Amino acid sequence: MKLLALFPFLAIVIQLSCWELGTDALPSGGFVRTKGVQFSLNGYPYYANGFNAYWLMYVASDPSQRSKISTAFQDASRHGLTVARTWAFSDGGYRALQYSPGSYNEDMFQGLDFALAEARRHGIKIILSFANNYESFGGRKQYVDWARSRGRPVSSEDDFFTDSLVKDFYKNHIKAVLNRFNTFTKVHYKDDPTIMAWELMNEPRCPSDPSGRAIQAWITEMAAHVKSLDRNHLLEAGLEGFYGQSSPQSKTLNPPGQFGTDFIANNRIPGIDFVTVHSYPDEWFPDSSEQSQMDFLNKWLDAHIQDAQNVLHKPIILAEFGKSMKKPGYTPAQRDIVFNTVYSKIYGSAKRGGAAAGGLFWQLLVNGIDNFQDGYGIILSQSSSTVNVISQQSRKLTLIRKIFARMINVEKWKRARGQGQVGKRGHKINN
């Protein structure tokens, strides 16, 4: 029996089943792969119900604060979260990882080492981003400034994507991260299955080139560079999901602005293994009503999940979403609606074997790091209705994975049994 034929049956079973199937926990070791429109881990479908915590390296660089990292992963694991996304960059400025091109701060690198070690201990996979689009933690601007100080004729942050020296700086940073030897786990990053994927950049944009050609060429070049150094890990571009010239009919879905990216064309590039989308209706449409923002969210998610499934044929993660407590009129119920909407779209696709493979809320915090609270932060240890929504999604996706695992194991057993009962001439062998 083919697994595709069982997807409708699976949906019914999930609705009728209790949460705990009694199946032994599936192993979390090994490298995450893609298989069609799904992620796969150790031969079974894998789902990324997780969170963003960009501050992990920064906080862990101070040994006296590392207990906060342990608490974060412990809390996440208790709530069934499986993936965390964080920064592998801090370029120039205060507490830099990279002081100047090729010059690194060992304390910061050891902070990232520790975060990866704790993630590994708690069975959580990590997505590491190589650079930032924005000025915080250096970003494109810092790379361009470094090139300008060496005499390059660069005048705009957008030169990050085209200047040869800037690109060399960036490629060298990628190489430094991939070849980093973790001082805690004694494993090079490029060989560490705790890392689920690399991300080229957090939210790349090139507004000076609305055609999208600059970023298309840059992603093509950098994806090839990463894959030349590391064939173990998945790679994604860090895109927010804005449509471009390759799908003009979908550009009406975009929020206002010029971004220089193309969701379809950028994600078709060889070496880009899965698709990402971000969504912040309260930021992108601040003057719109709550209902209008939710209408946008539903259309935005539907379009991207469908395109990942039917056009790109790759898994998709909603890599950033949330609801700010700092917006006028905010209520916890509004945030719950946003989370439930996102999770329902993911679950509806996943239970049918579709492309939606998970969501990472922005952002996870713990007690004692109030300076990182941007309005979106969620502390799992503080009981709230949103935390219950998060935990429920973890249980749902875990159940799907267990059911798929049972189906796969039954198919393996049937094939093995059939082979064992047939002799060399095709005669059935009696027991």
From Swiss-Prot:
Tissue: Expressed in stems, flowers, siliques and seeds. Expressed in root vasculature, leaf hydathodes, anther filaments, stigma, sepal vasculature, at the base and apical parts of siliques, and replum. Expressed in the micropylar endosperm and radicle tip in early germinating seeds.
Stimuli inducing this protein: By gibberellin in germinating seeds.
Catalytic activity, as annotated: Random hydrolysis of (1->4)-beta-D-mannosidic linkages in mannans, galactomannans and glucomannans
Gene3D superfamilies: Glycosidases
InterPro entries: Glyco_hydro_5, Glycoside_hydrolase_SF, MAN-like
Cellular component annotations (GO), alphabetically ordered: cell periphery; extracellular region
Binding site for substrate: W87, N202, Y280, W362
GO BP annotation list: fruit dehiscence; fruit valve development; plant-type cell wall loosening; polysaccharide catabolic process; seed germination
Signal peptide location: 1-25
Keyword Signal: yes
General function of this protein: Required for both, loosening of the micropylar endosperm, and rupture of the seed coat in germinating seeds. May participate in the hydrolysis of the mannans in the cell wall of germinating seeds.
Protein family according to the UniProt entry: Belongs to the glycosyl hydrolase 5 (cellulase A) family.
Protein name per Swiss-Prot or TrEMBL: Mannan endo-1,4-beta-mannosidase 7
Lineage of the organism: Eukaryota, Viridiplantae, Streptophyta, Embryophyta, Tracheophyta
Gene symbol of the encoding locus: MAN7
